[in-house]
Amino acid sequence: MSLMIEGGRRLSGDLTVQGAKNSVLPILAACILSGDVCVLQRCPHLEDVDTSIDILRHLGCAVRWNGPDLEVDSSTLTRWDIPDRLMRRMRSSVVFLGAILARCGQAELSYPGGCAIGARPIDLHLSALRTLGACIREEGGRLDCTASGLAGAEIVLSIPSVGATENAMLAAIGAKGVTTVSCLLYTSPSPRDRTRSR
């Protein structure tokens, strides 16, 4: 594929940019933490957003569209579990784990699904949450998570993971103390530096 761009003409006009799916999904999970009304302007109306809305409603949140904007009221949150049928509809459903754990001190859910890329384990997510003090029991395809008190910690991911970082950040909001998230890949000294230190 190639593009040919002919310039020399002044550009003018207005363009309304819709929100991005990869940004809005963790923001929807973060709405849980506010305990109040959040408004997402120009929220994209996509299947994964609809699944997130279904999860929020299952948890007890009031969610409604107001034109292109989405309003989420999490003051009415009453549950901390996500059923398998909702978890399996999209890969990023696991990002709700950190937010629910921070808000409720417990969470019950199954492994996520919905990813056409193939199996991608969530061990980095679970490791990050355990580092913050969460107790996580994995049994029969379900995750039973409790946190009597999350504490700030230094989380070092073995490989880069946007989702695990998002989950750690959401859970860290409910933790006491400072949390830092880094990646071993970027924090390890280079081979040259290791040679110098010998």
Region annotations inferred by a language model:
Residues Q41-P112:
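Glycine-rich, N-terminal phosphate-binding loop and its surrounding beta-alpha-beta segment
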Residues T165-E166, L170-T180:
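Internal alpha/beta core interface subdomains
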Residues Y186-R198:
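Single conserved hydrophobic/aromatic residue that forms the stacking wall/gate
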Residues W80-V156:
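Hydrophobic alpha-helical hairpins/lids featuring a short glycine-rich hinge
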